Amino acid sequence: MRLLPLAFVVMAMFGAVAPASAASALMGCDAFVEKLRAEARDLQVDFSHALIVSRARSDSEVFDITTKAEVDGTLTCRHDGFARFEAHLAEPATARATTAFERLSAAALRAALGWDAGKSRAQAQAMASDAKEFLAASRERGDVYVAGKTEEHVPGGVSLGLIYTDVDRAFAIVGPQE
């Protein structure tokens, strides 16, 4: 009979550890902002509080992201925890803007997940290649909504998404809180 309470203690310990490890996969918002500014210094990334009009009460802070390139985005934080990052690029885009979008996406991966430059660049390029291929296939099929979408799931409950359409591109990192 003594084993039953011990089993509950062990299960409770592992249950308490799992959410902590998922949440620790991403850094806090302040750390993300500083690291992204450093990683994408040449893009002159700037953050400003977004104006949100809503009747619903929210514990989220939303920031608009601007760069000196034609790339913008949003950052959503909850209780100083990273919740969501999105980068946007309008199409048709110049080669310079496309490069800036890819660089900002890779820099966000480094800032959010602590990946090295090679891993983050490879992940961003692999997702971009898939999205381009899926967009071409969507056009060939004559889909009603023409888009190339791809997503990846990384440890800690974090999801990565990339979507290409004829009018824009969007890259997202979504934390386990979202």
Predicted features by range, described:
Residues 5-16:
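Bacterial N-terminal signal peptides
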Residues 18-63, 75-85, 96-103:
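Short helix/turn-capping signatures at newly exposed starts of structured segments
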Residues 25, 42-55, 114-151:
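Short glycine-rich, low-complexity/disordered patches
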Residues 149-168:
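Short, exposed beta-strand-loop hairpins at the edges of beta-sheets
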Residues 176-178:
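Short, solvent-exposed mixed-charge patches
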